[in-house]
C-alpha cells in the first residue's frame, strides 16, 4: 500500500516528537538532544515571550506525541539560570492522548515564586516529561515579565479531541516527571533521584519545592485546560482528581 507525501507529512510532527512546547515560544526542537538536561541542550533565546505581570498567570501549550505522558512545569529566575530550575509552577501530572494540550492559567504569583516579581525580570520555563523508556525529556522557553504586555490567549492554547489530564496525588505529584513513569510510579532504578546524567543536582531543590508547592498551592495552581469538559474528572478545590 502506498501513501501520498501529504498523508505522511500529516503524521510526521506527532511521530517525530515526544512533545513540543508551543507556548511560551520555545528555544526550538531537536529530537536528538531532547533527553539532555537542561532544555534539551538548546541555547538561550534572545526572543523572550512577554508575560503580563497583571495577569498573574500565563498559558502553557504543548503538542503531545505519546498517548500517555507524565509532565511537570518548572521555572528558573534570572538572565541565565543554568540548571537552577527550583520553582515548581505545576507538579507532575499525566496527559492522556495525542496532539494539542493547554494549561491556560499557570500561576506565577509571589507565593509560588518565593520572591516579588518586577517589571523586566527574566526567567526560563522548563517543561519536562518522563523519557522513552526512562529518564526525561526537556523543552524550555525564555520569558520576561512585563507591565506593558497584553494578557492574550495564544491560538496554540487549545485541546485536541479526546485528550485529557489526570492529577497525580501524594508521592506521584511530588516526584519529578523525569523520575516518573506515565502512571506516576518511580522509574526502574530511580530511588528519588533523577536517572538522567547530570540532572540530579539541578532538580534536588526542585524536588523539595514540588513537595511543598503541590500541597500549599494546589488550589491556585489548578490542573485545568482550555476546555474543562475534556478532563472527565471531579473538580475538588480547583484541582481535577481521578
Swiss-Prot record:
Its membrane topology: Lipid-anchor; GPI-anchor
Lineage: superkingdom: Eukaryota
Name of a matching Pfam family: BIM1-like_dom
Keywords from the named record: Cell membrane, Glycoprotein, GPI-anchor, Lipoprotein, Membrane, Signal, Transferase
Disulfide cross-links: none
Lipidation feature positions (GPI-like-anchor amidated alanine): 218
Residues excised as propeptide: 219-242
Glycosylated sites: 47, 86, 122, 159, 178
Biased composition (Low complexity): 180-214
Listed GO CC annotations: fungal-type cell wall; plasma membrane; side of membrane
Major place of residence: membrane
Presence of keyword Aminoacyl-tRNA synthetase: no
Example GO molecular function: transferase activity
Region spans: Disordered: 176-214
Matches recorded under InterPro entries: BIM1-like, BIM1-like_dom
Localisation: Cell membrane
Keyword Transport tagged: no
Post-translational changes noted in the entry: The GPI-like anchor contains a phosphoceramide lipid group. The anchor position has not been determined.
Signal peptide: 1-17
Name of protein: Uncharacterized protein AFUA_6G02800
